[in-house]
């Protein structure tokens, strides 16, 4: 009971922060903002009904209408709907849930399919993932996906879902199945009806206390039988015989991306018994289940439907200075859900791009997901009545600034630390931007390599660094001393690709300093412009000072 209550409280807190945050407006400001949006929506209505034209996309109209309602309700404190977060737990899965890699488009899918055979397409059913464990012919355990390795014990709940077979026989008598618990629908047309918040509804039903009859509105779509029959046709037949009929009905053999596209489009427009958000293409040949790990499934991919764009309020405009000195602009957003992702930030780009967009805090922007699930701005759909735009920092930075710390160099200096600690450079595991900020704030680094001098005691006493991780971090810092010379040169920001640097065969600092512009220019992917940049870099006073400091620390390749 206490566990469920804690989960419920966290849901309510999360939900209220996402959906029920009201603008911090004075009564006069609220009246002005509401009145302006009201007038705009009325104008759109008049254009549509009186003149038969639409100046705004349906989705934008619907969401701005909902935003107007939200603003109006903010002043009478009406509650919002609950959105359920993902569930985690402590029950170990017999077989890990791998997850599925998403294909950006049909071309990407075609490339993936080219080297594979015996492929099958299934709908990507929108619900919550579950493991079903059968032992001696009976349902022994049901576990929520959680983090892929561990999840919640859902056995009691799943045993009350009449659509889930409680007993099985034959090859399934001692088996582990993976699938999706979904909300049963009658003739759901995805193209017309959308997602209807199905995942949150299923999660809500699975979390609700008591033996509710509403669980009978759920069913399961089995999409994996680890260590099951080798032939997909045999798997489907056995599953159907046991009562998992939907798997056989909605699994089709495909040979290429064109066939997948046809099925995907068919299911997008067809009447289905569940909500979907795309399709999954999987190979019948799978590795043994003991090799399954989260995020490492190479035998299946997903091709999702185009995500729905969302209108989001801009809460703040922030500026960041990258390691190369370029200033980028980021919009902090009131959280919105896009394709089951909570989006709170979107990259605008350069200062010039931000000025072209003319975005200020309080504006409403249309956000969607680009490839790889990265949020992007599609449009500015509404600008607030009172608009104050922050002043960007002076453009005083470049690729050769901020190797040494100073007040004006704070952001670029931190960006350099994040870069040198990344996997492709010095590989300092266990520390990111927040950790670097904590270390620099406490120990006031002189330059980007000052962390090499930190003692275990200093790390242990650093606010923001967990004491349990301080020893591991100190170990990582010491291991970095043994990294190859080229890694240290990359950490110093040499303007070369790793391939070009490796091809140079430079193995010492003295050798690098004596290399000519002509030498650098002959490297792969390095033209005259890049070669000149390398010369400017190695002749920079800060770089020379860092090289001498690393030599004093006896870093490989830098010693005299």
Curated annotation (Swiss-Prot):
One term of GO molecular function: DNA ligase (NAD+) activity
Chemical reaction(s) catalysed: NAD(+) + (deoxyribonucleotide)n-3'-hydroxyl + 5'-phospho-(deoxyribonucleotide)m = (deoxyribonucleotide)n+m + AMP + beta-nicotinamide D-nucleotide
InterPro entries cross-referenced by the UniProt entry: DNA_ligase_AS, DNA_ligase_B, DNA_ligase_CS, DNAligase_adenylation, DNAligase_N, NA-bd_OB-fold, NAD_dep_DNA_ligaseB, NAD_DNA_ligase_OB
Catalytic residues of the enzyme: 124 (n6-amp-lysine intermediate)
Class of enzymatic activity (EC top level): ligase
Gene3D superfamilies assigned to the protein according to its UniProt record, in alphabetical order: DNA ligase/mRNA capping enzyme (3.30.470.30), Helix hairpin bin (1.10.287.610), Nucleic acid-binding proteins (2.40.50.140)
Gene Ontology process terms (BP): DNA repair; DNA replication
Alphabetical list of SUPFAM superfamilies matching this protein: DNA ligase/mRNA capping enzyme, catalytic domain, Nucleic acid-binding proteins, RuvA domain 2-like
EC number, as in UniProt: 6.5.1.2
Keywords, in A-Z order: DNA damage, DNA repair, DNA replication, Ligase, NAD
Keyword presence, Transport: no
Coiled-coil regions listed: none
Function in brief: Catalyzes the formation of phosphodiester linkages between 5'-phosphoryl and 3'-hydroxyl groups in double-stranded DNA using NAD as a coenzyme and as the energy source for the reaction.
Stored NCBIfam families: PRK08097.1
Family note: Belongs to the NAD-dependent DNA ligase family. LigB subfamily.
Protein's UniProt name: DNA ligase B
Organism, as annotated: Shigella flexneri serotype 5b (strain 8401)
Classification lineage: Bacteria, Pseudomonadati, Pseudomonadota, Gammaproteobacteria, Enterobacterales
């Amino acid at each position: 009971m206490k566990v469920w209550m804690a989960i419920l409280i966290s849901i309510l807190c999360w939900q209220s922060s996402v959906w029920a945050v009201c603008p911090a407006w004075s009564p006069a400001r609220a009246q002005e903002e509401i009145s302006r949006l009201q007038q705009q929506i009325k104008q759109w209505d008049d254009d549509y009904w009186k003149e038969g034209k639409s100046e705004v996309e349906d989705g934008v109209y619907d969401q701005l209408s909902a935003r107007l309602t939200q603003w109006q309700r903010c002043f009478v404190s009406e509650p919002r709907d609950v959105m359920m977060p993902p569930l985690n737990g402590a029950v170990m899965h017999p077989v890990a849930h791998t997850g599925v890699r998403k294909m950006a488009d049909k071309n990407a899918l075609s490339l993936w399919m080219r080297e594979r055979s015996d492929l099958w397409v299934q709908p990507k059913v929108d619900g919550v993932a579950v493991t079903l464990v059968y032992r001696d012919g009976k349902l022994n355990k049901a576990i929520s996906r959680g983090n892929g390795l561990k999840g919640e014990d859902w056995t009691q709940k799943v045993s009350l879902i009449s659509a889930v077979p409680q007993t099985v026989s034959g090859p399934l008598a001692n088996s582990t199945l993976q699938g999706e618990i979904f909300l049963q629908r009658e003739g759901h047309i995805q193209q017309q009806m959308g997602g209807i918040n199905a995942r949150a509804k299923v999660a809500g039903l699975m979390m609700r206390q008591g033996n509710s009859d509403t669980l009978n509105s759920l069913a399961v779509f089995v999409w994996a039988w680890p260590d099951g029959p080798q032939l997909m046709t045999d798997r489907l037949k056995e599953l159907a015989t046991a009562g998992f009929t939907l798997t056989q009905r909605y699994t089709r053999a495909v040979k290429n991306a064109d066939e997948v596209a046809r099925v995907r489009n068919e299911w997008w427009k067809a009447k289905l018994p569940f909500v979907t958000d795309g399709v999954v293409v999987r190979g019948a040949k799978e590795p043994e289940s003991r090799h399954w790990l989260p995020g490492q499934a190479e035998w299946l991919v997903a091709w999702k439907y185009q995500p729905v764009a969302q209108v989001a309020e801009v809460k703040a405009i922030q500026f960041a200075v990258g390691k190369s000195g370029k200033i980028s602009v980021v919009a902090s957003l009131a959280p919105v859900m896009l394709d089951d992702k909570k989006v709170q930030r979107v990259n605008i780009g350069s200062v010039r791009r931000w000025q072209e967009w003319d975005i200020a805090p309080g504006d409403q922007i249309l956000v969607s997901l680009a490839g790889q699930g990265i949020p992007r701005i599609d449009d500015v759909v509404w600008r607030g009545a009172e608009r104050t735009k922050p002043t960007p920092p002076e453009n005083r930075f470049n690729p050769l600034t901020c190797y040494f710390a100073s007040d004006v160099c704070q952001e670029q200096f931190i960006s350099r630390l994040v870069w040198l600690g990344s996997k492709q450079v010095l590989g300092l595991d266990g520390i990111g931007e927040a950790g670097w900020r904590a270390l620099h704030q406490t120990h006031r680094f002189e330059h980007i390599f000052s962390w090499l001098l930190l003692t275990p005691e200093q790390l242990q006493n650093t606010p923001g660094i967990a004491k349990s991780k301080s020893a591991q971090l100190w170990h990582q810092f010491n291991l970095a001393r043994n990294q190859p010379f080229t890694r240290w040169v990359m950490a110093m920001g040499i303007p070369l690709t790793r391939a070009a640097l490796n091809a140079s065969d430079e193995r010492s600092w003295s050798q690098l300093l004596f290399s000519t512009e002509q030498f650098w220019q002959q490297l792969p992917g390095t033209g005259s412009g890049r070669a000149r940049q390398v010369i400017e870099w190695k002749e920079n006073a800060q770089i020379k000072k860092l090289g001498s400091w690393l030599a004093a620390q006896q870093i490989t390749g830098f010693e005299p």
